[in-house]
């Protein structure tokens, strides 16, 4: 089964708001305790060219786990994000190919 990926790109009014939300994300995701059957990864990255933007990458090995996390995030994360009212774009896809280069 291919990996399921969700990419969420947010643009806040300024870098301070973005960093405040990143701190909230770090706290909320550390509290996640859903019972998942496979590996699930959350990565959060701030744009190096524009600190008012960040991207969250969610990677699931199973549809069931993705749904568990999606339900939790809808209740726990989205209401907090929506208070900041950033411009937001979300893409959900299945991984078609992966290329890795180098030893490490």
Give each language-model segment a name.
Residues 11-24:
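Short, surface-exposed ligand-recognition loops at beta-strand->loop->(often short) alpha-helix junctions
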Residues 45-51:
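A short beta-turn/loop motif at secondary-structure boundaries
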């Amino acid at each position: 089964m291919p990996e399921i990926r969700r990419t969420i790109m947010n643009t806040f009014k300024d870098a301070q708001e973005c960093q405040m939300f990143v701190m909230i994300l770090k706290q909320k995701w550390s509290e996640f305790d859903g019972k998942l059957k496979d590996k699930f990864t959350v990565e959060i990255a701030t744009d190096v060219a524009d600190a008012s933007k960040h991207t969250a990458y969610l990677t699931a090995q199973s549809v069931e786990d993705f749904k568990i996390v999606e339900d939790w995030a809808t209740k726990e994360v989205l209401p907090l994000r929506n208070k900041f009212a950033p411009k937001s774009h979300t893409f959900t896809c299945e991984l078609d190919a992966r290329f890795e280069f180098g030893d490490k």
